[in-house]
Regions:
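Active-site beta-to-alpha loop of glycosyltransferases that engages the nucleotide-sugar donor
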Residues: 6-20, 43-47, 83-86
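Short beta-strand-to-loop acidic/aromatic patch adjacent to the donor-nucleotide binding site
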Residues: 101-111
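Active-site-proximal specificity loops/subdomain of glycosyltransferases
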Residues: 46-100
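Hydrophobic targeting segments
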Residues: 1-7, 23, 35-39
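Active-site donor/metal-binding and catalytic loop motifs
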Residues: 228, 247-257
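Conserved catalytic core of nucleotide-sugar-dependent glycosyltransferases
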Residues: 113-221
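Short, well-formed alpha-helical segments that are part of the catalytic scaffolds
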Residues: 12-27, 50-57
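Acidic donor-binding loop at a coil-to-helix junction in glycosyltransferase catalytic cores
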Residues: 227-236
Length: 257
């Protein structure tokens, strides 16, 4: 079984439709894969409050008819101001299934490769590990180890004065990390990327679509940590435990920062 979990804050809801459409498309592309979905709708206003006259419930209401919300595989958790402060690091620390093949960290701003669940279903790695999907070129070269194989070779950050031939700014949209990529653009790019290739890489974690194999000791995020840098905390954990990271270098995720 694969557990896909995602935490949505009320102020992120403009991105939910695209996120859920993408998850649903990946589920439909792999109909025989056993997948459970766990979604947290976080209505807390401890950090930010809606504009005067707006209600937090209104931000979520238009999404409640979505097919993913009604899917029998989907479980919903709701957090409100009646609960103690709770955020994405709490969710990621708590929602991990030690018996699942993978627990996947979804993100509101991230769309999936169409064959995402099919790949996870087919992969067979007989040891504890973390699997990630390739990203677009980031703000510095340290991220090249988890960058898609077709998007390598650009100098980062922008250094046009000394890197006129390979400056990151020469890469066309939407293939830099700061560009917005649509599902159609992502699907086309991945369709043109050939066979699935998986390689062990040096540890480098960004929180979107991290796929954590079953069997890890918990907690792997510090108790009491609520949000910000929980992915870095997890990277420190797997480094210390020497748990290998592998990357699907030929499949791009759509992390729209």
């Amino acid at each position: 079984m694969i557990l896909y979990q995602v935490h949505h804050m009320w102020y992120e809801t403009a991105m939910i439709q695209e996120c859920w459409d993408s998850v649903l498309a990946a589920l439909k592309a792999s109909p025989n894969t056993d997948v459970k979905i766990e979604i947290c709708l976080n209505k807390q206003t401890y950090v930010e409050k809606p504009n005067e006259g707006s209600k937090v419930d209104d931000f979520f209401s238009k999404h409640l008819d979505h097919s993913l919300f009604k899917d029998p595989r989907t479980s919903i958790t709701i957090k409100t101001d009646k609960d103690p402060f709770y955020n994405i690091a709490d969710w990621r620390r708590e929602v991990y299934d030690v018996k699942a093949k993978y627990t996947v960290w979804g993100e509101t701003d991230t769309i999936l490769p169409r064959d995402f669940f099919a790949i996870l279903d087919l992969v067979q790695i007989d040891q504890l590990h973390v699997l990630t999907f390739a990203g677009r070129p980031m703000w510095d070269n340290s991220w090249d180890v988890v960058t898609h194989e077709r998007l390598q070779g650009y100098s980062k950050p922008c250094q046009c004065d000394v890197h006129k031939e390979d400056c990151i700014e020469l890469l066309e949209e939407p293939f830099k990390y700061k560009d917005y990529i649509t599902q159609a653009e992502l699907d086309k790019f991945n369709d043109e990327s050939g066979d699935v290739k998986i390689e062990q890489v040096p540890w480098k974690i960004d929180g979107s679509t991290v796929c954590i194999s079953g069997g890890l000791e918990t907690p792997f995020i510090a108790p009491g940590m609520h949000f910000v840098r929980e992915d870095t905390c997890f990277e420190y954990y797997i480094r210390k435990k020497k748990i290998p990271q592998v990357c699907v270098t030929s499949r791009l995720k759509g992390h729209n920062y």
